[in-house]
Regions:
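S-adenosyl-L-methionine
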Residues: 1-33, 46, 66-67
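SAM cofactor-binding core of SAM-dependent methyltransferases
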Residues: 26-97
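SAM-dependent nucleic-acid methyltransferase catalytic core
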Residues: 2-20, 72-178
């Protein structure tokens, strides 16, 4: 979703480790059986780890864990709805309203995270819609281009989390004690 075809990422996340993955993996033990991603965020560390281990992605932000659970369990419906969603400031502003429907809440979260400035839409406060002013990509402005390019790549993320992931929504200390 970054133009890099070798790594998976569902969305950019403030504090994410996407660009640091190779460096981080060098410090992983040679042999271990369980990768616990305590502060999973965009799950980029565990999504891209190639070793054969049990993967547990823990994130305290319920919007993030809901998004990944919906992507895992309702991939086609979520992606269908996202493809119908325009890249627009009104859509972004409306996405802050909570929904009782898990699929709709996941869609709204993805709108917030992908259409916000630097992915700050994962936070609990509206930091503003990312309006492209300078950068023109193949599909138009930077915001629209990134929105359009990212959605279809969610299929790859869904496939990986279905195959070998446990997703938890716990405080880090509760996750460790398990």
């Amino acid at each position: 979703m970054s133009g890099n075809k070798d790594k998976l990422i569902a969305f950019n996340y403030f504090g994410g480790k996407f660009t640091w993955l190779e460096y981080l993996y060098k410090y992983f033990p040679d042999k271990f059986t369980h990768l616990v991603d305590l502060f999973a965020g965009s799950m980029v560390v565990s999504l891209n780890y190639k070793g054969r281990v049990i993967k547990t992605a823990n994130e305290i932000n319920a919007d993030i864990t809901n998004f990944f659970e919906v992507l895992r369990n309702n991939e086609l419906e979520l992606i269908r709805l996202l493809l119908l969603t325009p890249c627009s400031e009104l859509e972004y502003n409306n996405s802050w309203e909570p929904s009782a429907d898990k699929i709709e809440q996941a869609r709204r979260f993805y709108v917030r995270i992908r259409q916000s400035f630097f992915g700050l839409g994962a936070q609990r406060k509206n930091k503003g819609w990312h309006c492209a002013k300078q950068h023109v990509n193949a599909q138009g402005g930077e915001t629209v281009s990134r929105w359009n390019n990212a959605i279809e790549k969610l299929h790859d993320v869904a496939e990986v989390i279905r195959s070998n992931f446990q997703i938890t929504n716990l405080d880090y200390s509760d996750c460790i004690s398990r």
